[in-house]
């Protein structure tokens, strides 16, 4: 027995003997040790299994653990989850059972029998699991680990309970979840799936309405909505948006300034905001953007831009002061939240709204650009990508905040007209949107897993007019206005020589891998990393790592004081002063 293995087994023996130490802390140490051993055995594996359930399944397959041994490890995982999240009190009998389960797994993974000293103080093998949840006919959400698929079923392992055999999940069900069928061949073994609105069938199979691939990898709502173009909604549109620079910064700059105007009108008290003062704030907030915007270097275009700014300022004033209180809207700016951010692990998306009532009954997404002026003659309609964005915000409130979608009132504010448009679209459209999200995530995973120029070359080759023109458009509009931007990308890519292309693909792979690990975490990292730790790490883990401020109390708020007193400007630093209510000596700021 080498020294490393000896120390691993010795740590188990010490945990059993250290009776003075609280069981909850010993559970944490047991879990940390097991996760470290699992990570070390996966260091040279391309699979980014950052979730412990997926790691256990991978190790079970790699080292031929029996189903009983794997179920015992899952029982340990679930019990430690409950203990570390304070959902239950730790029990000594269960702790020693779980130490036995981990030791038995080590004996196979480390190819070294359990030392007699440790074996003698552990209970006998007990493979029977008690970690089964009560099943109901309709389940809101189930997290599972994908194994394989055939033409009718996905075969998966549940993450939140122990199962003796794979669950069978029906897919390709017409009108229910058939939109996800195209993406199933891209699923990989041990991938995490969220099954939403799941029906338990009489034959013991499951039929979900949504199948969400790798939900810990959050896709930005606005980026996902931008996949919906006039010519189609292919996932390669996501790649093109990432790679093609913005030709004209004017619309983006105007949108940012319009958002500033909305802030001013929402927070205004008796005295109305002044346009000139607001523009001065805009110049302070966006000095570089205004200085480098090419259109503003032309005197006529500069004049038109600031005329547009004043028009949007007036339209926002009209909307906030008049339309908000009109019959049918009942929007109250005094009880609103500006730019609330949301994370929706259920659907694997994230986003930020422009305006929301505090009770989440109504929300507004503001657009400074054009609506669809041509779909219906003489009528202004929201663009498809804007409708998609609103549907996704509704879905976030439904699945993350528990707000019934039928009680939500979403509005699109087109400040160009102005038009405050009730933007309720068909809920059935959410399914194909999430299916596109899955295909985007599969592309991202494939890029970082293969990490090879040839794979990336094939992926980026999808950015061509034939592939992206899913609606088979023809005629002047397609040929002169839509196709050229797609063709231009391919021309620039093809103009590179072999070395330049290889450099581009390698750089793209590197950035994609860094982005993937920054979101989902890195299997090779000693600690939990990535944005997903927000919901995957327990409070104890965050606290011990010094990565959370909690139980804080504001004792002085200087953040929102006005900059003026009458016409006189007042200089002050916007500050917030907090006081700890729970003393701690550990803080860690990355």
For each feature predicted by the language model, list its residue ranges.
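Accessory interdomain/linker segments of ATP-dependent helicases and helicase-like nucleic-acid enzymes
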Residues: 113-162, 458-589
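Structural motif
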Residues: 17-28, 226, 244-255, 380-385
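Mg2+/Mn2+-dependent nuclease catalytic core
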Residues: 158-188, 333-439
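Charged, glycine-rich intrinsically disordered N-terminal tails and low-complexity linkers that flank
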Residues: 133, 142-145, 164, 168-294
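Amphipathic alpha-helical interface elements
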Residues: 1-122
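A non-catalytic, helix-rich entry segment at domain boundaries
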Residues: 261-338, 513-515
């Amino acid at each position: 027995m080498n020294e490393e293995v000896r120390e691993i087994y010795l740590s188990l023996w010490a945990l059993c003997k250290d009776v003075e130490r609280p069981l909850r802390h010993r559970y944490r140490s047991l879990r940390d040790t097991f996760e470290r051993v699992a990570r070390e055995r996966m260091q040279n594996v391309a699979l980014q299994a950052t979730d412990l359930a997926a790691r256990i399944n991978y190790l079970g397959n790699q080292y031929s653990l029996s189903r009983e041994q794997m179920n015992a490890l899952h029982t340990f995982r679930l019990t430690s989850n409950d203990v570390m999240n304070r959902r239950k009190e730790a029990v000594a009998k269960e702790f020693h059972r779980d130490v036995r389960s981990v030791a038995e797994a080590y004996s196979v993974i480390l190819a070294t029998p359990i030392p007699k000293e440790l074996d003698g103080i552990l209970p006998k093998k007990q493979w029977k699991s008690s970690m089964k949840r009560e099943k109901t006919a309709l389940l809101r959400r189930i997290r599972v680990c994908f194994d394989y698929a055939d033409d009718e079923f996905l075969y998966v392992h549940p993450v939140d309970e122990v199962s003796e055999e794979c669950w069978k999940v029906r897919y390709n069900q017409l009108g229910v979840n058939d939109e996800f069928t195209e993406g199933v061949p891209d699923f990989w073994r041990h991938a995490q799936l969220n099954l939403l609105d799941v029906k338990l069938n009489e034959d013991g199979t499951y039929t979900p309405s949504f199948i969400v691939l790798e939900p810990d990898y959050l896709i930005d709502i606005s980026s996902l909505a931008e996949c919906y173009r006039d010519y189609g909604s292919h996932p390669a549109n996501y790649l093109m948006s990432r790679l093609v620079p913005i030709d004209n910064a004017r619309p983006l700059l105007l949108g940012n300034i319009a958002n500033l105007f909305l802030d001013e009108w929402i927070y205004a008290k008796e005295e109305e905001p002044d346009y000139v003062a607001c523009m001065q704030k805009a110049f302070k907030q966006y000095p570089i953007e205004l200085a480098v915007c090419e259109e503003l270097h032309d005197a006529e275009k500069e004049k038109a831009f600031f005329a547009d700014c004043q028009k949007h300022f007036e339209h926002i004033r009209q909307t906030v002061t008049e339309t908000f209180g009109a019959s049918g809207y009942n929007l109250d700016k005094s009880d609103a939240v500006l730019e609330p951010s949301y994370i929706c692990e259920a659907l694997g998306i994230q986003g930020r709204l422009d305006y929301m009532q505090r009770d989440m009954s109504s929300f507004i997404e503001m657009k400074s650009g054009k609506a669809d002026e041509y779909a219906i003659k003489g009528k202004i309609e929201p663009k498809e990508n804007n409708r998609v964005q609103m549907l996704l915000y509704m879905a976030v409130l439904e699945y993350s905040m528990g707000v019934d979608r039928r009680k939500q009132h979403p509005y699109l504010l087109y400040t160009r007209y102005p038009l405050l448009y009730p933007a309720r679209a068909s809920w059935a459209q959410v399914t194909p949107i999430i299916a596109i999200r899955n295909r985007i995530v599969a592309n991202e995973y494939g890029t970082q897993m293969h990490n090879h120029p040839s794979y990336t070359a094939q992926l980026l080759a999808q950015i061509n007019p034939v592939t992206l023109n899913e609606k088979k458009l023809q005629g002047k509009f397609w040929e002169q206005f839509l196709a050229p931007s797609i063709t231009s990308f391919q021309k620039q890519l093809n103009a590179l020589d072999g070395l330049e292309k290889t450099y581009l693909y390698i750089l793209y792979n590197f950035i994609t891998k860094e982005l993937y690990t920054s979101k989902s975490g890195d299997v090779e990292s000693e600690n939990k990393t990535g944005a997903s730790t927000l919901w995957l790490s327990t409070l104890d883990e965050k606290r011990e790592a010094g990565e959370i401020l909690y139980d804080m109390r504001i004792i002085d708020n200087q953040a929102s004081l006005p900059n003026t007193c009458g016409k006189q400007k007042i200089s002050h630093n916007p500050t917030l002063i907090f006081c700890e209510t729970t003393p701690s000596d550990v803080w860690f700021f990355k």
